[in-house]
Amino acid sequence: MKNIAMKTTVVLTILLLSVLTAINADTMKKRSDYCSNDFCFFSCRRDRCARGDCENGKCVCKNCHLN
């Protein structure tokens, strides 16, 4: 009986870890692909640019001052 409980615990632990890993990978992918005009605007303002637009999933800063 003890052996069956141990095997069940190991299997459930492995399943839980695989689910958590899949969720984390999906979350990280969404974060790296995240792009919105508001996010780009504030990101580009930090770099002293007047505008920031989301184009093709990437932030594009416009009207930047280089000093």
From Swiss-Prot:
The keyword Chaperone does not apply. The keyword DNA-binding does not apply. Disulfide bonds join 35-54, 40-59, 44-61, 49-64. GO terms for cellular component: extracellular region. It comes from the Eukaryota. GO terms for molecular function: potassium channel regulator activity; toxin activity. Expressed by the venom gland. Keywords: Cleavage on pair of basic residues, Disulfide bond, Ion channel impairing toxin, Neurotoxin, Potassium channel impairing toxin, Secreted, Signal, Toxin. Residues 1-25 form the signal peptide. It is found in: Secreted. Residues 26-31 form a propeptide. Belongs to the short scorpion toxin superfamily. Potassium channel inhibitor family. Blocks Kv1.1/KCNA1, Kv1.2/KCNA2 and Kv1.3/KCNA3 voltage-gated potassium channels. This is Potassium channel toxin alpha-KTx. The lineage of its organism: Eukaryota, Metazoa, Ecdysozoa, Arthropoda, Chelicerata.
